[in-house]
Amino acid sequence: MPRSTKKGPFFDHHLIKKVESAAGSKRPIKTCSRRSVILPQMVGHTIAIHNGKNYHPVVINENMVGHKLGEFSITRVFKGHGGDKKSGK
């Protein structure tokens, strides 16, 4: 179920403060807040999103506005299905 429109988008205030203070800077902004919605103020910034193990840098563009940060940093690594053990030798 999507969030109610009368509540507005969710974002962590500390992340917005970091984005506003990093205006003009090329350094990525590190965050663990995967639940925050991407706002128009973030466009053009590089945000390093934590995926549980390390930080994955993502450049924010206009098409990402309205999505959540966690959508652009995957947390699971697919190693492949079983397969034939004999072909590996």
From Swiss-Prot:
GO molecular function: rRNA binding; structural constituent of ribosome
Gene Ontology biological process terms, A to Z: ribosomal small subunit assembly; translation
Pfam families in alphabetical order: Ribosomal_S19
Classification via InterPro entries: Ribosomal_uS19, Ribosomal_uS19_bac-type, Ribosomal_uS19_CS, Ribosomal_uS19_SF
Alphabetically ordered keywords of this record: Ribonucleoprotein, Ribosomal protein, RNA-binding, rRNA-binding
GO cellular component entries: cytoplasm; small ribosomal subunit
Its biological purpose: Protein S19 forms a complex with S13 that binds strongly to the 16S ribosomal RNA.
Family as reported in the entry's similarity comment: Belongs to the universal ribosomal protein uS19 family.
HAMAP family reported for this sequence: Ribosomal_uS19
Name of the protein in question: Small ribosomal subunit protein uS19
Species of the source: Xylella fastidiosa (strain M12)
